[in-house]
């Protein structure tokens, strides 16, 4: 055991609020930059109350859910055409019920994967596309060549397909599962996008028009499954071929899972207000946003440890990020970073009180999470956390040096550092620690494997697209857009389009990583995909994480706070 590990295992827990009085903090009156973040719109008294006053699921609803679950299992076991089975799987997944039917879904998809005897999907655009998407999502490889039958001799998609809106929509969604170099899928995406955009306002079926509009705003593969489930439950209710058993179970299940999440939110809110970090004026106070992100990554009730530790580490991480970005001087940040590298509180007395509070909160919470993992999972994760925190803070330190030195790095250098500074290697490692098979498996995340590299790079670039206007106004660190502008002389508009193109290309690489990263299994592969989907949710239209009163508020409220009305039973 090295010295840092020994320190972590034996260090006493320090209550930072006993040692730091923010009201009399001597560095509070100094001329320091501020994040200018607005106060949280979420009432912390209300959030804390959710620990005991969350939505209680009645016993009769629990019994009804079990009854309906049995009926759905019967559906999976009943004889049906392959396309009908695919559509059943698709609806179950989109309704958010896949965690209840993991075995049935895998068996259904694997049987369809093996059954190529008569090519039942051949020439059927919707069937071919749905089969392609669902099997690739499940980790079963289907070649892009299955779409050649819809192309002419010059490689263009047949114009007759333009009248098949349902098929075009399925083709559009399937195209986002493509890999780098799969030109047929690139053509499919361009073709389907073009003709869906021109057709959706004239679609007679309201449910189909709603689905098309929703997909064009953001493809299914890029959406957060839990948020999508809330939207799809309402959309599915309006469809002519809606299955009432599936709909009723989806509503019950959504509320049951939400009740579990609410209790966790309440307990986490109680912890957060004891840290003192919620009182720091320069930093973001975003506990509920952090929970929403953990829920995006791992909403299944069985991932409680992953969710809670991601929120705890993530909430502290956000404050550390803001300290490096806008608060600390370069000398202070160098001392902070060296203390993290030593994983020691010995030198932090030289820091101003606010940075002492932040360091001790980080130190305490990380050791506390490590002890919880030791208790619940049976292995020592603290060395893994220390490596991740050192990597994290050194990336922040480098960005601070660029800022204080007025240096604009090349885009490639910025991106390699930025994929760490975005925080997702640390957060995904936190999630991995909560589900790893054993202690030896923790070695897989250092050095950073491709799966984490590309998911984190995507989150960095998506974040940059959404936050650059606000952060430029605050005088924050550079973003990829500015690095590209500086290196090429391009306008901001051109730079934005370039970064959007890079995002699309890196999604293709990540899609392939999900097949190539054999050292990782589910659910960690999905954790990585979902982290990027969370980035799309928070940053697709601006800074929905830092600005709490934004478009994200409605979705967060519907997913975390408001249950679905059940109506008459």
From Swiss-Prot:
Residues holding (2E)-geranyl diphosphate: 284, 321, 325, 460
Entry keyword set: Lyase, Magnesium, Manganese, Metal-binding
Binding site for Mg(2+) 3: 463, 467, 471
Single GO MF annotation: terpene synthase activity
Superkingdom of the source species: Eukaryota
Residue span of motif DDXXD motif: 321-325
Binding site for Mg(2+) 2: 321, 325
UniProt GO BP: diterpenoid biosynthetic process
EC numbers, comma separated: 4.2.3.82, 4.2.3.83, 4.2.3.81
Pfam families: Terpene_synth, Terpene_synth_C
Xref: InterPro entries: Isoprenoid_synthase_dom_sf (IPR008949), Terpene_cyclase-like_1_C (IPR034741), Terpene_cyclase_plant_C1 (IPR044814), Terpene_synth_N (IPR001906), Terpene_synth_N_sf (IPR036965), Terpene_synthase-like (IPR050148), Terpene_synthase_metal-bd (IPR005630), Terpenoid_cyclase/PrenylTrfase (IPR008930)
Cofactor: binding comment: Binds 3 Mg(2+) or Mn(2+) ions per subunit.
Residues noted as binding Mg(2+) 1 in the record, renumbered to the chain: 321, 325
Essential cofactor(s): Mg(2+); Mn(2+)
S-S bridge residues: none
Catalysed reactions, semicolon-separated: (2E,6E)-farnesyl diphosphate = (1S,5S,6R)-alpha-bergamotene + diphosphate; (2E,6E)-farnesyl diphosphate = (+)-alpha-santalene + diphosphate; (2E,6E)-farnesyl diphosphate = (-)-beta-santalene + diphosphate
Recorded domain comment: The Asp-Asp-Xaa-Xaa-Asp/Glu (DDXXD/E) motif is important for the catalytic activity, presumably through binding to Mg(2+).
Family designation: Belongs to the terpene synthase family. Tpsb subfamily.
Known function: Catalyzes a mixture of sesquiterpenoids from (2E,6E)-farnesyl diphosphate in fragrance biosynthesis. Catalyzes the formation of alpha-santalene, beta-santalene, epi-beta-santalene and exo-alpha-bergamotene, as well as traces of alpha-farnesene and beta-farnesene.
Name assigned to this protein: Santalene synthase
